[in-house]
């Protein structure tokens, strides 16, 4: 079975959003963000000097890779997609490209991705990795500075530390951090079923192609989602929580290739919806807008009937625990 056939029959996976934002749980100095928890640095404009100190107290003593993997497997999921690095710029694995990572910057000093890769191999699960290839708020040249509206904070780009967007050069970030880190995750953790990119903006077609070609060089069977940007993908990620009523009668290739939602041409007919169980991706302790188990099952069956995979997210807390209510729903 090739990777396209596997993906089509997989149907159901678990996404995990976990990072320094999990420590805050949606609250900063007594104020709560009304938006998604993993965007809290942007929402409150928390400067890197202060935000990065969170790493010194990130010690998730209850993290257990086998528990995460066996939980997903027991829920009938076929693959797991974990945030190796989200927009905050902090990596959950040991990165030689940037010491702002779980092993070098926290008292935990364990490579979370390595442990998850081992657990997935042991239990016969596929591992995919999310990687934010455009937004990186920890880097002065992180992308996103072409957009001014529609985000869950005060800016797509880090305008609270680096307010002059005209001085930013994404190519520096791409060459010095993005490319080296993508190469790391491709070469350090065995076979990956997919790389899940996000929010393309200033990334050029040439840069998207560089990432595409690097992935296919190291892991020819690794699938690439549409948010890599510029049409260089294997399958289409629909919008966040997008549950279409029906498939369009015709799908052409005129859609915005960098758009985050809606149907666009998929070269192998592969589609996916990533979705939350409440109203946030990263842990937010006061978000109780939970979907019912019945709604989750209805959405899964509806999407799968149309041939669309359902990638359901959990947001573990700062100690590494998947919230009990998430487990109850699934």
Residue map of PLM features:
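Mature catalytic domains of secreted/periplasmic carbohydrate-active enzymes
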Residues: 1-330
């Amino acid at each position: 079975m090739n990777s396209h056939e596997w993906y089509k029959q997989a149907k159901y996976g678990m996404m995990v959003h976990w990072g320094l934002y999990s420590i805050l749980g949606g609250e900063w100095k007594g104020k709560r963000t009304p938006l998604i928890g993993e965007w809290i640095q942007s929402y409150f404009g928390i400067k890197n000097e202060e935000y990065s100190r969170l790493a010194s107290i990130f010690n998730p003593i209850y993290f257990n890779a086998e528990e995460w993997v066996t939980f997903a497997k027991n829920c009938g999921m076929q693959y797991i997609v974990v945030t190796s690095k989200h927009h905050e710029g902090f990596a959950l694995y040991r990165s030689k490209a940037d010491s702002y990572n779980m092993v070098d910057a926290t008292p935990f000093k364990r490579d979370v991705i390595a442990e998850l890769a081992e657990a997935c191999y042991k239990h016969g699960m596929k591992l995919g990795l999310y990687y934010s290839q455009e937004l990186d708020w920890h880097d002065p040249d992180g992308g996103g500075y072409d957009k001014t509206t529609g985000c869950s904070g005060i800016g797509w780009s880090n305008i609270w530390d680096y307010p002059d967007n005209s001085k930013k050069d994404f190519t520096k970030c791409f060459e010095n951090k993005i490319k080296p880190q993508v190469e790391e995750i491709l070469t350090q953790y065995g076979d990956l079923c997919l790389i899940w990119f996000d929010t393309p903006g200033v990334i050029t077609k040439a840069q998207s192609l560089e990432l595409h070609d690097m992935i296919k060089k190291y892991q020819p069977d690794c699938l690439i989602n549409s948010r890599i940007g510029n049409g260089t993908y294997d399958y289409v990620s629909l919008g966040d929580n997008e549950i279409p009523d029906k498939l369009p009668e015709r799908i052409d290739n005129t859609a915005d290739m960098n758009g985050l939602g809606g149907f666009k041409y998929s070269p192998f007919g592969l589609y996916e919806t990533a979705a939350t169980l409440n109203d946030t991706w990263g842990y937010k302790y006061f978000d109780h807008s939970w979907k019912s188990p019945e709604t989750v099952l209805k959405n899964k069956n509806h999407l799968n009937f149309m041939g669309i995979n359902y990638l359901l997210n959990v947001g573990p807390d700062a100690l590494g625990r998947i919230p009990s209510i998430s487990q109850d729903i699934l």
